[in-house]
Amino acid sequence: MNKIVICILSFFLLIFSSSFFIVKEGERGIILQFGKVLRNNKQKTLVYTPGLHFKIPFFENVKILDSRIHTMDNQADRFVTKEKKDLIVDSYIKWRISDFSRYYLATGGGDFFQAEVLLKRKFSDRLRSEIGRLNVKEIVTDSRGRLTTDVLYSLNKGTINLDSTSLINVNSMNALGIEVVDVRIKQINLPLEVSDAIYNRMRAERESVARSQRSQGQEKAEKLRATADYRVSLILAEAQKKALMIKGQGEAEVAKLFLENFGQESSFYFFIRSLHAYENSFKNSNNIMLINSDNEFFKYMNTEIKN
């Protein structure tokens, strides 16, 4: 008897516990009845907000979905501009579930990773299409805001009309039950091979400028050296000229004095000349002269000094 009561109580307790479910903050719940999403009389999906809710046990199952905004990084990829130039674009998008029923059905039971795979594919296609309409200058400078705005609008609405050009796309985000909240471009770079080529060209240009400046510097240095050498030559020539003039004036003055003194004291003049001759003759101790002592050269040596 006790076992039967316990079994009955356990059964009702199981039914009672299966009749309620809790939806947490940042989540939403939908009811599946025999594998189909439960709708109201207006054929709108019943979405359960955070709180405690009732369901029919065994016949209805609850699927909890994340209602928060998600950030999805789009791996840096190569894109071609209007000018047929390649760019490496690194971007990300923010998204959230806008239609929980459609999201559940489109992603195979609310598979988050499947949703991001589909979203990345659509986002990459749309971004590629938009970049293909712009040139590099527009993308890098004033049109980055317009670019992301156009991508955001086209992802959510499916079509955009700019400059009378219609870019048609299937309502893929609506089909997934997803709303793209924001689109951002983190970084725009040139491909590595292009960057290397630009760097090499810039380096070659800088080296050419450096060589030109060094050549100009060497040319100026040569001109300065030549000018300095010329001025030195002029200064030396002028100095030598003045020295010769001074020397000539001195010799003339000496000759004048000698002539004047020679006329007055000729013996003293010859005496001085003999002393100079003695000095020059015996300057080198290795010199040997064989001269008769009665020679005129020794005239003043043989003369006795008288007080």
Swiss-Prot record:
SMART domains: PHB. Keywords: Membrane, Transmembrane, Transmembrane helix. It is found in: Membrane. The chain crosses the membrane at residues 3-23. It holds the Pfam family Band_7. The keyword NADP does not apply. The keyword tRNA-binding does not apply. CDD domains: SPFH_HflC (cd03405). GO terms for cellular component: membrane. It is a single-pass membrane protein. Belongs to the band 7/mec-2 family. HflC subfamily. HflC and HflK could regulate a protease. HflC and HflK may interact to form a multimeric complex. This is Protein HflC. It comes from Buchnera aphidicola subsp. Schizaphis graminum (strain Sg).
